[in-house]
Amino acid sequence: MTIKIGINGFGRIGRVLFRLAQERENIEVVAINDLLDPKYIAYMLKYDSTHGNFKKDIEVKNNNLIINGKKIRITSIKDPEKLMWDKLLIDVVIESTGLFLTKDTAYKHILSGAKKVVITGPSKDDIPMFVRGANFDKYKGEKIVSNASCTTNCLAPLSKVIDDHFGIIEGLMTTVHASTATQKIVDSASKKDWRGGRGALQNIIPSSTGAAVAVGKVLPNLNGKLTGIAFRVPTANVSVVDLTVRYKKTATYNEICEVVKNASEQKMKGILGYTEDEVVSTDFNGKELTSIFDAKAGLSLNKNFAKLISWYDNETGYSSKVLDLVELVALK
């Protein structure tokens, strides 16, 4: 079965997941909706400062995108209800504008003819969140779902492994996060987040994040046990989670590493990675794993208290799991 998808919003995540979708034989992108001119959409897809040039032939013909001879419909429509997904027999819409984050607004895609909707970020209401490595097995056919955030996708698989083996009592997370498109290049007005308005190239910026709390939604056993903060740093891509955690079952740091390594090779293969190399952030650029445990970067204070470090490409890794969720919802 070929899954026909439409992408609403062709920003960083929209473009990265489009690239990844080209490598999946069972997924076909048949439509893109964005307010940009089609020629500019083609340009932004072709050239990427972080991930390099797009490897396939791109052209624009009659306001449609042509990739290796295959036509992709381009529209510039603000109201999702007018997108006419039914005319293209769309199975799943990927909602990546960051604007339609409630059931009522996302449901407009259903009214337009889409069968399912996957939101690329945490919702603003009770839209269920599904994270690979945490709760994909709980999906029951819901029409509108969220893939949570990139940080939740990093933290949840690691937290599940630790909780399953050692029993998490409580934990604090810090994500050291690469800059994103919502930040300001130089100091600019930001009424809701004063610090967030400061220049992204000049500063390490403390920020709030709901990623750790969201883990409790996809892993109910951890509800109320985790919270966290973020620091935005002047890098283009790749972020890292620092999970400082207290657990019930005594274990040395080496024993924890062994458990994570085994999980990365078995149950969590393709989701959770493991490395003992002397790595830095750019070494993870382009990695589709959503959480890569860095054994040499962490440590423990005693047998019940440890600091665990896990890297993630906040664009590629996350986009890869969005497509995994698309496959899940399309087949149920």
Swiss-Prot record:
Binding, D-glyceraldehyde 3-phosphate: 149-151, 180, 209-210, 232
Location (main, coarse): cytoplasm
Pathway named in the protein's UniProt entry: Carbohydrate degradation; glycolysis; pyruvate from D-glyceraldehyde 3-phosphate: step 1/5
GO biological process terms on file: glucose metabolic process; glycolytic process
UniProt-annotated binding residues for NAD(+): 12-13, 34, 78, 120, 314
Keywords: Cytoplasm, Glycolysis, NAD, Nucleotide-binding, Oxidoreductase
Family indicated by similarity: Belongs to the glyceraldehyde-3-phosphate dehydrogenase family.
UniProt-recorded name of the protein: Glyceraldehyde-3-phosphate dehydrogenase
